[in-house]
A protein has these predicted regions:
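Helix-start/capping segments and mature chain N-termini
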Residues: 1-65, 69-223
Length: 223
């Protein structure tokens, strides 16, 4: 399957802050290394770290979103962009993808520039800014840009990685800290969920609230 994909690069998106530097840098580099091993990409973490350090000296005094890519030849490319509110601005709508994803697809477990499963999901519901993905077993996995966390009476839960989702760095940190726990989330569970969050290491916590009588969730706070 991997050989059938168009040429792709490994990808990490990092938050850089003037006072704190790169958020969860070690976790990003560890995930990058795992993906390089899986896809057999040459990777020098030393060179990647040096490149990130050099870039940080030019980032100025405002938050930046850093895009790090590694080619199949091991070439490192960095881009910095001033952090804005992204596609999930206050009032943005998130729906449910019309078709399931295949949890056996290895690209769901690794962050790369190959995003066909995500673009297809978005194109299936073009009226929304983002959509929740679900697998062949009717289990919720993530959105196209973030991990999902549901607020339940028993605490905050997020789907296990085995369901077919990216092991987000912020998600991993929250699990380690005991702030969230893994539990299956079915489509039925989602239908009845009023309050939930989308999380990633660049945006932090994005809070959503369900609209009355519709399977649509609106962003009510961002970051």
């Amino acid at each position: 399957m991997i050989q059938q994909q168009q040429k792709f690069e490994l990808l990490e998106s990092l938050l850089w802050e003037p006072k704190n530097g790169y958020f969860l840098l070690d976790r990003h580099l560890q995930r990058l290394e795992r993906s390089a091993d899986y896809f057999n990409f040459p990777l020098s973490l030393t060179e990647a770290s040096k490149a990130l350090q050099a870039l940080s000296m030019t980032c100025g005094s405002v938050k930046q979103k850093i895009r790090l890519t590694i080619s199949c030849e091991g070439n490192i490319k960095l881009q910095a962009h001033t952090l804005d509110s992204g596609i999930l601005k206050i009032g943005a709508s998130v729906g449910i993808a019309s078709q399931p994803i295949d949890s056996q697809n290895p690209f769901l477990y690794h962050k790369t520039t190959y995003r066909l499963p995500y673009t297809m999901a978005l194109e299936s519901q073009p009226q929304y800014q983002d959509v929740f993905l679900w697998n062949q077993d009717g289990v919720i996995t993530e959105s196209t840009i973030a991990n999902i966390v549901i607020d339940t009476p028993a605490g905050l839960i997020t789907p296990p990685v085995k369901c077919g989702l990216l092991p987000g760095t912020f998600r991993s940190q929250l699990l380690e800290e005991g702030k969230i726990r893994e539990e299956l989330i079915t489509l039925d569970d989602l239908h009845s969920t009023q309050n939930l969050f989308l999380i990633n290491s660049v945006r932090g916590w994005i809070r959503l609230k369900k609209e009355a009588s519709r399977d649509v969730w609106k962003v009510v706070s961002n970051g």
